[in-house]
């Protein structure tokens, strides 16, 4: 177990959780950089968005017990490596619902937020963040999210709406911490 303060952001694809996470780093929270086996997107920064690794590396580290939490989403691994956490630092992290459940057990000093956004805004964000969006992939992510995020609003501490004003959403999170 860790005594670090942790803000956990959970939200569907296109909800703006990564943009909120980025803004929270300007307010004294350090981003936990997760590992993933997914392909790099146009707007990704290696070592800042994620640590990009292959599936073999990921599976070996899982088998060695080196991930605090991990999940498979759309056929790709995502997880937080033990080496990513240092004692005494306050963190912010974006995760899926299974990651949220794992982290709440490891970090009892956490505050969790579901980042909610209307579907039109979500879709436009997803389409605009990639240079050549693959509509089939985006639709699959949305369908998967429909199932995966079912009932998450009842499990988190707060629900934050992020339809049009990210600074307003960030301020609500900061007021709640």
Located regions from the model:
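Walker A/P-loop
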Residues: 17-18
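Hydrophobic anchor at the beta1->P-loop junction of P-loop NTPases
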Residues: 9
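Post-Walker A helix-loop "phosphate-sensing" segment adjacent to the P-loop in P-loop NTPases
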Residues: 26-34
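P-loop (Walker A) phosphate-binding loop of NTP-binding proteins
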Residues: 12
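ATP-dependent small-molecule kinase phosphotransfer cores
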Residues: 36-91
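Small-molecule kinase domains that catalyze NTP-dependent phosphoryl transfer to phosphate-bearing small molecules
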Residues: 132-177
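Conserved phosphate-donor/acceptor-positioning beta-strand/loop module used by diverse small-molecule
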Residues: 92-96, 106-127
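Phosphate-binding P-loop
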Residues: 1-4
